[in-house]
Amino acid sequence: MFSTKVFAITRRAALTAACATVLSSGAFAQSGAPLRTGVDATFAPHAMVKLEGGLQGFNIDLGEELAKRLGRKITIEGTEFSGLVPGLNAKKYDFVLAPVTVTPERAKAMLFTEGYLDTDYTFVIKKGSPAITSLNDLKGKTIAVNKGSAYENWTRDNAAKFDFKYDVYGNNADAVQAVQSGRADANLAGNTVAAWAAKQNPSVQTTYTVKTGLVWALAFRLDDKAGRDAAGNALKCMKLDGTVGKLATKWFGFTPGADAAAVKVAAGQGVEGLDGYDTTPFKPVCAKT
């Protein structure tokens, strides 16, 4: 397990007042204790270990900014992705900061904020290997995926249909290594992670992308609507002032469009059309800067 990093955030009275309407109960109302959350610290560029110690990445910056706007301290722990949801349910974590793909199944088990990034699925192959131009090209291949991720679910659901095998790994870095070593023909990961892997590893390259229409969002326990709504308010404000878009440009090298999840603000709280979505029109309360 990676070392825990605590970010001390100075409380600002204006922000506290701005969030007062949504901080009514649960962990988010306990101002004396830091928010506790976790990430897969091998899931670059969303979260990764710095050489000098500590964590960095898109989701680390997102978590720091979220805590700042809530006037809270935050503890971000690095662990395997498969341990994050059990940790949330055991109340080890107040929410999951790691990218969690929102699916109908997951929306029945957790409360989500609105999405902060769109997530498509991209294959990574060894450089020089034949490109994957359609899902039919997966026949006879072995796909490496991160255990407990949406990519494992996708490969499990589609392996028989497209006649491929899949292996699961404790983290995505090991899945990419399986491609580099020839133990797997391709790795399936989110589009941002796949692009980063190819950028950092000249021996691999990206290929076919599966369009999903899915988003990444912050995950909370079903009984913590107050926490979800507090974080949701802050996230909406971060979209409105361009913070999420700037973080995407910093870490992924692209500027999200007007309809991208990093920019578009939902009318209610949660992911529209799925369980847990609150259709009540929600006007974010943002502190003046």
What do these predicted regions represent?
Residues 60-69, 129, 136, 142, ...:
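Extended ligand-binding regions for polar small-molecule ligands
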Residues 38-43, 77-82, 91-103, 119, ...:
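Beta->alpha turn/N-cap motifs
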